[in-house]
Structures are given as C-alpha cells and as structure tokens.
Amino acid sequence: TGENSRPHISVVMNFTKPTENKPALLTFNEVETFLHEFGHSLHGMFANSTYKSLSGTNVYWDFVELPSQIMENFAIEKDFLNTFARHYQTGEVLPDELIQRLVDASNFNVAYACLRQISFGLLDMAWYTRNVPFEGDVKVYEQEAWKKAQILPVVKETCMSTQFSHIFAGGYSAGYYSYKLSLIHISE
C-alpha cells in the first residue's frame, strides 16, 4: 500500500569464544569485520524509503558497500577505540604506540591488496559477461581473466573460482567491483 515500514535488522557473527581463563576477546580482524557488517545494518536502519526493493542494501551496486567500508575505518581511530578497547584485566586503554602500529599495519601491502581485489572483480565480470556457457579448464580461464592485475606468479594448483562464494552464492554476481568503487567514493 506504499506505507513506510521500518526494517528488522540483525548482525549475526561468529566471534572468538571465551576460554576457562579469559573472556571472549575480539581479534582486530573481528572488530573490523563487525564494523563492516554494522555498516550494512546502519544502512538498512537509516534507510527511509517506501519501497524496500530500493532501500538499504538493495541500492545500486555502485553504493552498496560504501556504508560498511566507511565503518571499517573506525577500527584504527584512537577516539573510537578508547570508547571500548580496554585491557580486560586492568581497564587500560590501548597505548598510542599500539594504535599507531595498527594504522601502520593497515597500510602495509595496501597496493598488493588493492590489485588482489581488482583481480577478483575482473574474474567476477569475466564469469558474468560470458555470452555462451563455459566449457574448459576453470584455472586457465581464471588466469586469463585476471592477468592484467597479476604482479606475482600464480600459485600452482590454486583456483579461486571454486571458492568465490561472494559471486556464486553470496548475491554479488557481476557486483564484486563495488568493494573497490566504494573506497574511491570514501576517498573523495
């Protein structure tokens, strides 16, 4: 009937479990992943649209990853970390030197990581812009698809396509590029 209805949203994740001697302590990767997924949930919660098919993560691929990737940036922000990241026994906040090491680590190998993501986008587009059904060697097809982004030799007997769940089972078919495009939007 065209009425505005608010979404029901949950973030469901698997985190490190507590041990007998320690509570559940999140890894940096878990914090970053939580922030990413929380960005998707905020996108849905703040959406204000009459039609759910045009709302939240149902937007154009060019924008779908923007809120989640923005949220990831908070993982290395001192002011944000100081609101919750404390030693589980002493309550001390993270030392500035450790936060700087997190920042430095996030910048390490960033060019290679960028090319790797571009290669995944190229592979995604190669699979979803075919005009005829595929018949052939998947590994050979894959290597041809992403050769423009390869700077290191391909590791023998690897095949990304067989485990690329984002594009074959995760709803990102012909849309994986959105991860890199959102980073361009963020940097503007």
Language model: regions and residue ranges:
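Cation-handling catalytic/transport regions enriched in His/Asp/Glu
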Residues: T1-S187
